[in-house]
């Protein structure tokens, strides 16, 4: 099992860190391919029925998460669309992209905050330290996503990532 997630706010950035018991190249790969992302992206009780990835600078990642857990009350049946536009990719080491809330056509939802995400993949002798830095345009935008439960959602998502990494290494 990997380590616990560490989260903190630094100015307008939400910083998340966690060590995964998997090699860096594998952790990087499961962030770069739709077939992998469909298996683990999103909090528990949510699936990814739609996901496309054009993994290159200027390329787009477009996905839909759907709540399939009846125990999640008003969220059951809800769809949440997202879109990322990749800016910089250093193979095995770094992904920088802008993350948007979107509709099914990939149009940005104007009244929801976007964020510039920098993901760093650090080799730790067969394990990988993943550091995600999400920079928001304002304190209000950051507070909006914190109030939406972003930290819990990412914790559950990264728990699912750990489980997926374990399954593909067997």
Locations of regions flagged by a protein language model:
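Hydrophobic ligand-binding cavity/cleft-lining segments
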Residues: 1-48
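Intrinsic-disorder/low-complexity, polar/charged segments enriched in Ser/Thr/Lys/Arg/Asp/Glu/Gln
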Residues: 11-17, 60, 81, 94, ...
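Short beta-edge strand/loop motif at the mouth of beta-sheet-based domains
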Residues: 15, 35-81
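Hydrophobic/aromatic beta-strand elements that line small-molecule binding cavities or substrate pockets
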Residues: 18, 50-53, 82-88, 114-122
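A short, structured loop/turn motif at beta-sheet edges
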Residues: 24, 53-58, 87-94, 120-129
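Hydrophobic pocket/interface hotspot
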Residues: 27, 37, 61-63, 86, ...
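Beta-strand/loop substructures that line and gate deep hydrophobic ligand-binding cavities in soluble
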Residues: 98-100, 106-152
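Short, highly charged C-terminal tails/helix-capping segments
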Residues: 165-170
């Amino acid at each position: 099992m990997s380590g616990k997630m560490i989260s903190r706010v630094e100015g307008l950035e939400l910083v998340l860190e966690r060590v995964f018991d998997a090699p860096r190249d594998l952790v990087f790969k499961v962030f770069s391919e739709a077939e992998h992302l469909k298996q683990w992206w999103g909090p528990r009780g949510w699936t990814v029925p739609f996901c496309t990835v054009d993994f290159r600078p200027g390329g787009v990642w477009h996905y839909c998460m759907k709540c399939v857990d009846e125990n999640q009350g008003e969220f059951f049946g809800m769809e949440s669309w997202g879109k990322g536009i990749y800016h910089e990719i250093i193979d095995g080491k770094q992904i920088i992209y802008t993350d948007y809330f979107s509709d099914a056509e990939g149009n940005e939802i104007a009244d929801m905050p976007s964020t510039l995400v920098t993901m760093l993949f650090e080799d730790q002798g067969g394990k990988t330290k993943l550091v995600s830095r999400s920079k928001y345009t304002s304190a209000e935008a950051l507070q909006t996503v914190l109030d939406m439960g972003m930290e819990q959602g990412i914790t559950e998502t990264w728990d699912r990532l750990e489980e997926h990494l374990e399954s593909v290494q067997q």
